[in-house]
Amino acid sequence: MFYKMIENKCKEWYNSENCTVRNLIEYIEKTGQMRDAQIEAIKVYLFLKIGCECKPLEFLFRYGCFNSINLNNIELSTATREYLEENPAATALFEYSRLTNDKGEQVSEKLEKQIKKDPSSIDYDAFFRTAFYGVSYTDYLFSLPMGAGKTYLMAAFIYLDLYFALNEPTNPAFAHNFIIFAPSGLKSSVVPSLKTIQNFNPAWIIPEPAATDIKRMISFEVLDQGKTANKSNKTKNPNVQKIANHQPLSELFGLVAVTNAEKVILDRIQEKSGQINMFEESDDEKDRQANELRNLIGKLPSLSIFIDEVHHAVSDEIKLRAVVTKWAQNHTVNSVIGFSGTPYLEKTEKFKVVDSLSVGTD
């Protein structure tokens, strides 16, 4: 339901004078190559990138960036009204509590009453931090209907980021390099994903000559090769070499790497009861190689990490979040963008608001 607030604000932004991409969206609609669900996702993506400066969702909700509610139309005590007017995070949660789902059911009448009665009883910042898993980096999830063309949407996002990054090279909202994690459970998913992205025609979403210029700048790498031993029996990781070939990494622009996270990025990581061990001090050659690749990817500047089918294995999810969190400490991660063809949560998650009240998010 958080999405409803984002969607409402996106529509408001798109129709306002602040929107700088209306002509671009009209161009995309005119070419007629993208599906409606893809165009809607592109609108939201550009709103988050440009209208919201690619900030983390937790930050955007806490600072009221998605607030659309008019408090003047609601019966409130003077004290509550003043509290909400001075606390955008409180207003955000208040607006969220009043949303209705497709069946017309309110998110939480109890929460609305609690805020009206005693708004200062809730730690709003803590609620939003918990609701978005406490991550410090930008992490957006796009859930599209099955068959709506997720991989083409990834390609569109890549080209759009590079298009704006070329115009504003120092704007931190736009990614310069990309790594795509193909679904873990599918052994043969990496190459088809790459081919689909390579076959994408950027002129469907970006006018010429920019479309062709950007296509020429992109270099693709598949990180799927096993270890190779040279004559000295010293094993090498060819995936490391593929990244290292793009030195100097600090100036790298337009790299699109595709890999299987489970086999490559999460190799040699142990997860037990939520605790992660990357064996960084290990003398084992395989541990060393796995960490060498992870460390190198962590140096790629303005990196956007695309995760296809984010909802698969829970253990892999924990490992992947640990790796991305470590990369984010280098201040090289622009964003993590998840793509799913099915709802991410099998059941509604509940987050505590006050001791006697929890709220579900979906």
Task: Label each residue range with its predicted role.
Residues S136, F174-A175, E251-L252, K299-P301, ...:
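Short loop/turn elements that form and flank the Walker-type P-loop nucleotide-binding site
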Residues T20-I28, I122-A126, G134-T138, S232-Q247, ...:
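Short linear interaction motifs
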Residues L144, T151-L166, K187-Q198, V258-D362:
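Signature of the SF2 helicase/ATPase Hel1-core->accessory helical subdomain module
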Residues L153, P172-D213, E262-K263:
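Conserved Walker A/P-loop ATP-binding site and its immediately adjacent core
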Residues A203-E281:
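Inter-Walker segment of RecA-like/P-loop motor cores
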Residues W13-S143:
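Conserved pre-motif I regulatory segment
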Residues I115, P119, A131, V135, ...:
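P-loop NTPase motor catalytic core
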